[in-house]
Amino acid sequence: MPLTMCDISDSPYQGYIYSCWVDQRNGTSDTDVFFSLSTDGGEAWSPALRVNDDNTTRHQFFPWMTIDQTTGIIWGVFYDRRNTTGSATDVYVVKSTDGGESFENFKVSESSFTPTSSVFFSDYSNIAAWDKKIYPIWSRLQSGQLSVWITIIEDTVTVPIEFTQFSASVYSGNVMLE
């Protein structure tokens, strides 16, 4: 299911429109998550960017995305089989700090699970983000039963400060910037 979201944050990407979907343009055994953006209100769209960064021909599917409207950072969650065999499935979260030009991928599920056709699980994933706290939620099969999982991610990465001029001295084995 494709999704669309608008950046209304006070970031450099304010006004951007984003779209995310899955397709099999790389083969029927390689479903991937794709992303496109518009900077002009939807008149023109960027070429499709593959969000999942694996080098496999495995499936990634059922994505959901959001924008932390306090930072403009895009977050997403999807099911992923890059590290597994058969139908065993993991859950990955993605992050873009550059308005959707690139995505960092990281696994959030503690272990893989194997879906079955007798238990529907796909529409039960989502992600919310606010003020550098991210809440991906997903469902999985646990001992034959559908269970819901959430992890709380605190995005506390600090931005390095660029020094234009400084001096340093060593005092008792410590470097002091002045």
Placement of each model-derived feature along the sequence:
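Extracellular, repeat-based ectodomains that mediate carbohydrate processing or recognition
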Residues: 1-157
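Pro/Thr/Ser/Gly-rich low-complexity, intrinsically disordered linker/stalk tracts
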Residues: 157-178
